Amino acid sequence: MQQPEDSHREEVERLRMGGSEALAELFSIHQDRLERIVQYRLDPRLYGRVDVSDILQEAYLEVSRRIQDYLDQPSVPLFIWLRQITNQILIDTHRRHLAKMRDANQEVRIHRGNYVNASSLSLAAQLVGNLTSPSRAAMRDEILNQLRAALDEMDELDREVLVLRHFEELSNNEVAEVLGIQKSAASNRYVRALKRLRTILDGSSLFSPE
């Protein structure tokens, strides 16, 4: 099995040898994952005003502009770097559009400088969509409120780890890179968050078998 370090080196070498064509190909390879990130983290108030494809196009232009800086010092895997730039474009988009909407009290929360924070509401909404059957559609608001309240009590970084692992589908190594923590810490936080989530779900009769 190919190790992450090997894949990292191969992508860097491919970029150095292939130029803009290689960059376009590699961005395309990672595009589905980047699109999933934008879809999950885009503020719902911007639906209809901001298109996911526009975010990705802007991210690609910024990647093209800064690729040499990355190649001069490729300290993180290519995908993590692409994700950082995409998230920064998303942060800038939120700031720009929310400022225009004059909604300072509800401005999207941004933490640690390199990602848009996952809210309890968005995480709960995803879980409700994934875990409830059509026959229980009428109960979803109640489920959503229960989950949101419980997730609000969870450590913010633990909650973010859940998002990175389950919705962005990052590996433990990638989570550690994104959050700037040790791999063991990322793993421990994931286990802790998963146990907490299972406790929340097991304690809710709304998720019992029909």
Predicted regions and their residues:
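Structural recognition of an alpha-helix C-terminal capping motif at a helix-to-coil junction
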Residues: 54-61, 76-88
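Arg/Lys-rich amphipathic alpha helix in sigma70-family domain 2
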Residues: 69, 87-108, 112-116, 140, ...
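Short, small-hydrophobic-rich alpha-helical interface motif
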Residues: 15, 34, 38, 55-63, ...
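A short, charge-rich alpha-helical start-of-domain segment used by transcription regulators
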Residues: 2, 6, 14-39
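Hydrophobic-face residues of short alpha-helical interaction/recognition segments
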Residues: 34, 38, 42, 63, ...
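DNA-recognition helix of helix-turn-helix
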Residues: 147-150, 158, 164-167, 172-203
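Amphipathic alpha-helical segment used for protein-protein interaction
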Residues: 34, 113-160, 170
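Conserved RNAP core-binding helix
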Residues: 8-9, 27-28, 47-69, 183
